[in-house]
UniProtKB/Swiss-Prot annotation:
Keyword Glycoprotein applies: yes
Residue positions the entry lists as glycosylated: 26, 237, 346
Protein name as it appears in the record: NXPE family member 3
Disulfide bonds: none
Length: 559
């Protein structure tokens, strides 16, 4: 009996050991799978749900970002975002300038040419790129922008570009108005330049540097600051306690970290490129240069049947592309009827008894400036804030309107921001009660263009969490997101704020806020589709259309 008991005990021990071994093997396999692949369902650029295997992208960790504590859902989302933004880099070695993309020898042709098209028809354009020796290129990776327009009608819309990775591109347009419609295709950057921009994004995120002034009594010191600082010198850790957003400054030699009084842009690093790389960034040669047509560059569009009018005028669903178009200089969204606020009284009536918060960079500060200029009853209060920095406040006491603007937290390239005014949007949102008379608009993008994408994803994750909480406690709060926009580019600005960088940020923004319950002002299409030159701060006619769209969300047309 004793022997049987010993055997039974031994058997149980062996069984326990076997179970532990199996458990360890399974855990190891799960961790391995988690590192390599993850199954995901996400929304593609067309707004359609796509089930896919998301491959974990191998990226160099940036500072402390590899030590982020992410939930499995957050990790999956980040991996899918990075995978979706993987630019199709050609598998070629170093390319000499003469073999890079030459917009002047490249051309496009209208494929489905016909005597005329009807409004609502699809127009397809084939682009073939060649090098400076007029030889066809065998790989893709160029960044193109495309639009259709009718100058006499002040009409315009953007097109969707598909890269076939063999030197050919196809552009798809939806013809949205009658008349003579012209096609315009531009090379923003050749694929050889994109490779340089990718390198800078991952290896040189400190190419814009920041500084802070520390002062105590008569002693003052200025040190460099950033999301991440190199070396082993002592640091002041200004990481936000609530959001976990990292920010550091080199510690002053004689002063405590608590003596910091401001933040400002230090400057831009010079000498980032070699002579060979510089050749890929030349104004008038290969930056935002037109690609000419081989044959007609226009088509004739006739009105559609009367029965089809309503179905095209308001196309429903997230997948609507383009999201809108210009006609007679007025933006016409395709998903809803936008109001025209041409009289200041219309805006006053809309915003009566409301508190409006504008958070973000200088592109949404333009909304504050437009509203306070256009609406005479909105009187700006002098808060003693630095010019172009804020915070700013405007009040209409008669109609009980309060309008506020505050810039987002670092990184921000403004001239001088007091330390007390360095506020993160997520924290500000957490302090808002919300309700039917509360309006929030957010624009956060331009100051993140020099950083790895994980930095921007983290910022939007924090903002989104705060937005969801705000809408949860006050569902009638109106929250509007302003997207990125295109801008003028030269050899230097391309290295810091290229449209290619901002296109990535814009894609992330749209995906992360899809399905959250916010409204979107599509500043990207509204600047790209317009006939005016691209600017970081668009001209007033474009800003007016943006504000009209914003106000249309706040005060929609009665149906």
């Amino acid at each position: 009996m004793w022997i049987n008991f010993v055997k039974l005990r031994l058997f149980c021990c062996l069984l326990a050991v076997l179970m532990v071994v199996v458990l360890v093997v399974n855990v190891t396999q799960v961790e391995y799978l988690d590192r390599e692949t993850a199954s995901a369902t996400f929304i593609d650029s067309g707004g359609q749900f796509v089930s896919s295997q998301v491959i974990r992208i191998s990226r160099n960790p940036y500072c402390g970002y590899e030590r982020q504590i992410l939930s499995s859902r957050e990790r999956l989302e980040e991996d899918s975002l990075l995978a979706a933004l993987q630019w199709q880099e050609p598998d070629v070695g170093p390319v000499p300038f003469l073999k890079s993309t030459d917009p002047s020898s490249s051309y496009f042709v209208i494929l489905n040419s016909a005597a005329f098209f009807r409004v609502g028809s699809q127009l397809e354009v084939l682009v073939h790129v060649q090098d400076f020796q007029r030889k066809p290129k065998k790989y893709g990776g160029d960044y193109l922008q495309a639009r259709i327009h009718s100058p006499k009608l002040q009409a315009g819309a953007v097109g969707r570009v598909v890269d076939y990775q063999n030197g050919f591109y196809k552009v798809f347009f939806t013809l949205l108005w009658p008349g003579q419609v012209k096609v315009s295709i531009s090379l923003v950057h050749p694929s050889e330049g994109i490779r340089v921009l990718q390198y800078l994004q991952e290896k040189k995120p400190d190419r814009v540097y920041f500084k802070s002034l520390f002062r105590s009594g008569r002693i003052s010191e200025t040190t460099e600051c950033n999301v991440c600082l190199p070396g082993s010198l002592p640091l002041c850790n200004f990481t936000d306690l609530y959001t976990g957003e990292p920010w550091f400054c080199f510690k002053p030699k004689k002063l405590p970290c608590s003596s910091r009084i401001n933040h400002f842009k230090g400057g831009y690093l010079k000498g980032l490129l070699t002579a060979t790389e510089n050749a890929f960034f030349q104004s008038g040669v290969n930056i935002k240069m037109p690609i000419n047509s081989s044959g007609p560059d226009w088509v004739t569009v006739i009105p559609r049947n009367i029965k089809e009018t309503n179905s095209l005028e308001l196309s429903q669903g997230l997948g609507t592309f383009p999201s809108g178009y210009y006609y007679k200089d007025q933006w016409r969204p395709r998903r809803f009827k936008m109001r025209q606020f041409n009289d200041p009284d219309n805006i006053t009536e809309c915003l009566q008894r409301k508190v409006v918060y504008l958070f973000g960079d200088s592109t949404i500060r333009q909304w504050f400036e437009y509203l306070t200029t256009f609406v005479p009853d909105l009187v700006e209060f002098n808060l003693g804030s630095p010019k172009n920095v804020g915070p700013f406040l405007a009040v209409d006491q008669k109609h009980n309107i309060l309008l506020k603007y505050r810039c987002h937290g670092p990184p921000i390239r403004f001239t001088t921001v007091f330390s007390s005014d360095l506020r993160y949007v997520a924290n500000e949102l957490n302090g808002i009660v919300g309700g039917k008379n509360t309006v929030v608009a957010i624009a956060v993008w331009s100051h993140f263009s020099t950083f790895p994408l994980e930095v921007y994803i983290r910022r939007l994750r924090n903002i989104r969490r705060a937005v969801v909480q705000l809408l949860d406690r006050s569902p009638k709060t109106v929250v509007v997101i302003r997207t990125a926009n295109v801008q003028e580019l030269g050899p230097e600005i391309s290295l810091f704020n290229s449209d290619w960088y901002n296109f990535q940020l814009d894609t992330i923004l749209r995906k992360m806020f899809s399905g959250v319950g916010v409204y979107l002002v599509d500043a990207w299409e509204m600047t790209l589709a317009h006939y005016l030159p691209h600017k970081l701060h668009p001209d007033e006619v474009i800003v007016k259309n943006q504000v009209d769209m914003f106000l249309s969300f706040v005060c929609p047309l009665e149906t």
